[in-house]
Amino acid sequence: MGKPRGLLLLALAACLLSGNRVMASELPACLSLTPGKTMESVLVASGVEPPELLTRLVYAESISTGLGDDPLVHLGIAWGVMNRARLGNLSPSMQTTYGRGIQGVVFKKGQFNPAVSERSQLSREFLCPKDVERWRLARAAAETALNGKGNPFIRTPWEREHNLSLVVNFYYPQSVQAQGPLAPWEGNKALKFVGDVPMGEKVLPASRIRFYRLAHPPSDLKR
């Protein structure tokens, strides 16, 4: 009885080891920030493509919210980034404000700190994701937002007509870096607070991410 049992235990251990290797292989390459380099230059030199770049940002940003295990938080961040990228593709003024394309949006100065700040510990999450389950959530959210179908932030008549969302500002009230429950720009008349966001059969509450819609569409929109 001892020998078959021992073989069974060895087989089980081999399966577990194989499973761990498969899970680890889902994670992206671990990158390092060397002296004199910026986060952007490291990612570009490593050949990271836009889908992975978006996934890395969603992964790190979700952790910075304090709600890194919530799939809706991942989705909200991914859609927010793509809203900026898509609006910037058609509006020079929005491109100046939020950046050009996914890379420009992600690395726009002052927009996604601490996730892409060289001086922040959270940048380690961006450079070297280690949590497989959270990476899966981030990747699924990024794929959904990149696909572009069913954007939960397209709500107004203008947005439906142009198939673009004006929801481009967001704030994480539960983040350790939050200055309070409300965003610093809360009283800005150029932005309108969105409230809770329906996502399919679920709702992303504003207590997790506060989203803001531009009060007016850009006047230089190209078609």
Explain the meaning of each model-derived region:
Residues G2-K3, L7-P51:
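N-terminal export signals and maturation junctions of secreted/periplasmic proteins
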